[in-house]
Amino acid sequence: KLIAGSNVYVNLEPCSIENNTPPCSNALIKYQIKKLFCGTLDPNPKINGRGIKLLKKAGIETSVGLLKNQCKELNRVFFTNQKKSRPYIILKSAQSLDGKIALKNGESKWISNPQSRKNSHHIRSTVKGILVGSHTAEQDNPSLTVRLTNNELGLNKHDKIQQPVKIILGNLKRSKKVSKIFAGNSKVIVGSMGSAKKSKNIEYLKYKKKNFLEEFMQDLLDRNISSILVEGGQKTLNAFLVNNLFDELVLYTAPMFLGKESKDGISIIAPEKIKASVKLKMIGVEKFKDDIKTTYYNKDI
């Protein structure tokens, strides 16, 4: 009753179908709002424009496009889920000034400094899943968890930190080498072409095609994993880059040189022409002591 005759501002079109909750548009009509200001239409084809039409039909004035770009930015994960049928994908890597991510022997701890690593945990806290390749899993035995305090995350001390689902891409040859990933009751998803035994908290997704990455991403979204952070090594990062399967790229660059014998981070096949290359849009630069963090959006997406 308090909103009767009021102006309502929303960043996304009010829903017009019943899913987990009743349609928002029906509630706005019921309580007789005066006008709706909407940032963007819902990209879901079942809703797109339908909620606005229902409001107009009920005699409610509507305005679409207020702060449109900001609203798209705010809802970028949802938009990607709806339009691409996959999670919003962030690629993350720490590199030297000469673009290396590890020494020849595989040593990579630590290229980035503690402040950069702390920042990367903030990114982990914003996604639904963290993905690494099987080689990285077996070589580094990572925990793939958010290791920050409630205070550092801006949470109340009694709030529970939501840990992302742990995701492994590829066949695991030495499961004993990944004990930290499988520790505790964390959910783990493994996507590969190989077979594996079923386990309590582990789901194995088996694929027939060699290039199953896109199908794997769709299956992750089907499991309500709406966003993932890819922290893989060269092979995994390049797989996503080659398939143009990413929305955001985060690079932490440390002030050091590791030399030509060290392992490259991004090493994809060169395009025949410059205009055929994957274009990025820089959206942010941050400094963590001597490390530089640069964040990019994929322009093609």
Label for each model-derived stretch:
Residues 241-280:
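Flexible, gly/pro- and Lys/Arg-enriched active-site loops
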Residues 9, 37, 63, 167, ...:
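Hydrophobic/aromatic beta-strand patches that form the interior of the parallel beta-sheet core
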Residues 1-71, 241:
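Zn2+-dependent cytidine deaminase-like catalytic core
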Residues 80-81, 86, 90-227, 235-238:
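Active-site ligand-binding patch in enzyme domains
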Residues 269-301:
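Conserved histidine-centered catalytic loops in small-molecule metabolism enzymes
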Residues 35, 129, 227, 247-248:
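Residues at the N-termini of beta-strands
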Residues 43-46, 138, 174-176, 255-260:
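Short gly/pro/ser/thr-enriched loop/turn and capping motifs at secondary-structure boundaries
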